[in-house]
Structures are given as structure tokens and as C-alpha cells.
Amino acid sequence: MKRITITLSLVCVSLLFIHCKEQTTTTTPDETAQVVSNLAKVPDSWVAERVAKAQAKFQASKAGQIVWQAMEAHGGLANWYKNGPLGFHFDYKPLDGSVQRNSYQIIDTWSSKARHQAFEDRSKEYGWDGQQAWVTTKDTAYFKYNTRFWALTPYFFIAQPFVLDGGGTNLELIGKREHAEKTYDAIKVTFDPGTGDAPDDYYVLYFEENTHQLGVIRYIVSYPGYFEKGKHLPEKLMELQGITTVNGIALSTGYHTHWLTEDEKAGEHITTITIDNIAFKPDTEKAYFTIPENASVIEGL
């Protein structure tokens, strides 16, 4: 009897050990994502919650429905966030010989943070940590343009229409527009006071009525670092020059920028933009977007 009791006890202990081992090694994908908290990429459950709120907001108006349709046509807002940070090379070339802006960059699409590296020398960097702009201290005079303004500017072009999920955004359907023998639904985007550095900016986005994809971006620049309040550059019109699909997301590969004429047509061609090396970077750590020790905070606009 004693021998049987000992044997049964050993069996029970073995079963308990196996059960505990199974319990400690079984995790859901979201739990795993929570554990790997050093990554900028967020858990899928966070994405699902944010996307559900966004869909409800966009479905509440005709303009919003068109934007949501466009997001779906470009691969879907959920897929956009699930892919994690986005990296690309953005080369902005004015045709009048003024300053070129040419950098590699990685963007935290969830939190709108950015880190740029100069095309000619990738040790020269600047960025936006979500609160402050910065530049590597030894290179404050290297960049011949306003790096605070430029930290997120390329992102707000390539990430259309997904960036319209941000707060403080207002949408207005302004009707149909014709461009290059295609018909588009035109949506005007404005911003609440206090939204970003330039809340007086606006965009007019053209979404092709059949494919629902973006074809044209019209915009103004009212950045206070360049202009007194209430003033801005004349409106510009950007034509998308191509689209590539990366991890299921349709993104532009370049733009031609024109002055907008009085009859809302493309006027003088003033800038050529090319975008390449486009790839999502899901392994990027949160710390990548913090201000480096060898950098200085940019004061003012």
C-alpha cells in the first residue's frame, strides 16, 4: 500500500509540473507584444480599438465616408498601423535651384515621431520625438532648411490618407474635380486651432471616383516660422507620379508640384519629389525616436 501511495504521489507531482509548465509557456500574440515593450510597434489590440473609433468617426459624414473608402483602397487603416514604423528616402528638388531636402527617414506612424539622416552623410541627423525637434549638435549649420518644419512634412505627404486619423482634423466634401481626364471626389482638410505648429494649413485631396485612391494633393504652407499669422504661400498642386504596394499598403513613389492656377489647374512645375527605399520597420525600438545624447533641442519655430 505504501509503495502504491508513493507511486501515485509521484504521478500527481509530474502531472502538476506539466500543467504548470504549459500554463507558463502559453501566451497570446498580444501578450507577447506587451512583453516586447521596447518596440515602437504596438499590440494588435491597441490597433483594433483605435481603428474602430476612427471608423465610427469617419462614417458619421459623407466626407468622412469618402476618406474611409480611400483608406481601404490604400490597404486599410488597421494594416497601416499593424505594419509598424515606416522607412523611406525622400528627395525634394526645387526646380529654381533653391535648397534641396534629401534624407532617409523612419517614422513612428502610431505616435508621429521622426528621425532623419542626411542622404550625403547618414551621421548627420535631425528629428521629432513627439514633443521637441532636435538636430545633432555638430550639424546645426549643416542643414540649410528648417528641420523642425521638415521633420514630419514628408510623412504628411506619403502617409495620406492615413494621417487623417489624427486629432483636430476637419473634413469637408467640396464636390467633384477633374484632373488629367479623370474625375475625383475632392475633400478639404482643415485643422482645429492649436493643432500642430501650423493649424492654418489646409489640404484639398482628390480621390479617384472609381478606384478611390489618392491622385492629387493641393495645399498651402502657413508655418509661423516662415510667415506672419494669416499669411501663407499661394496654393500648390501635387500630382502623384506613381504608386507602389508595400506590405499591402499603397504608397506614392513621387510627386510633381505645381503652382495652382486661378481655375484650379496645374500651373508652372516647380518641384520634383522622388520617394524610394520604402519599407516598414517593425523591429524599430521606441528608443530610436528619443533625442540622442549628441543632439541639441531646436528652440522656437
List the predicted regions and their residue ranges.
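Bacterial N-terminal signal peptides that target proteins for export
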Residues: 1-8
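C-terminal motif of bacterial Sec signal peptides marking the signal peptidase cleavage site
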Residues: 16-19
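Bacterial signal peptide processing site
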Residues: 21-23
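Post-signal peptide N-terminal segment of mature Sec-exported envelope proteins
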Residues: 27-57
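Short, solvent-exposed coil/turn segments at beta-strand boundaries
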Residues: 34-36, 81-85, 104-116, 126-134, ...
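N-terminal mature ectodomain segment of secretory-pathway/periplasmic proteins
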Residues: 49-52, 56-58, 62-141, 172-173
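Flexible, processing/modification-adjacent segments and terminal tails
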Residues: 58-63, 127-201, 225-231, 301
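Gly/Pro-enriched, hydrophobic low-complexity segments
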Residues: 184-289
